[in-house]
Amino acid sequence: MPVIKVRDNEPFEVALRRFKRSCEKAGILSEVRRREFYEKPTTERKRAKASAVKRYTKKLARENARRNRLY
């Protein structure tokens, strides 16, 4: 859990914004959304594999775009 210290004469809104930003960097909200409902291990593996394939295709597309720009 991210902890922030409220500075002297710091408005509440600014402290809240800093706390939200630290939570976002720590990945707490995405973790909570991921754990909200039970996910079967097969579904979890399927989702992980699909994201790996998506990353790979994006990487290939970037490399192809770079290669096409060079010539």
UniProtKB/Swiss-Prot annotation:
Tagged with keyword Ribonucleoprotein:
yes
Give me the Gene Ontology terms describing cellular component.
Answer: ribonucleoprotein complex; ribosome
Question: Which GO biological process entries does UniProt record here?
Answer: translation
Disulfide pairs here are none
Q: Which Pfam family is one of this chain's hits? A: Ribosomal_S21
GO molecular-function term, one example from the UniProt record? structural constituent of ribosome
Q: Which domain of life is it from?
A: Bacteria
Q: Does the keyword Ubl conjugation apply?
A: no
Which UniProt key words apply to this protein? Ribonucleoprotein, Ribosomal protein
Coiled-coil boundaries: none
Q: Which family does it belong to?
A: Belongs to the bacterial ribosomal protein bS21 family.
What protein is this chain from?
Small ribosomal subunit protein bS21
UniProt lists the gene as: rpsU
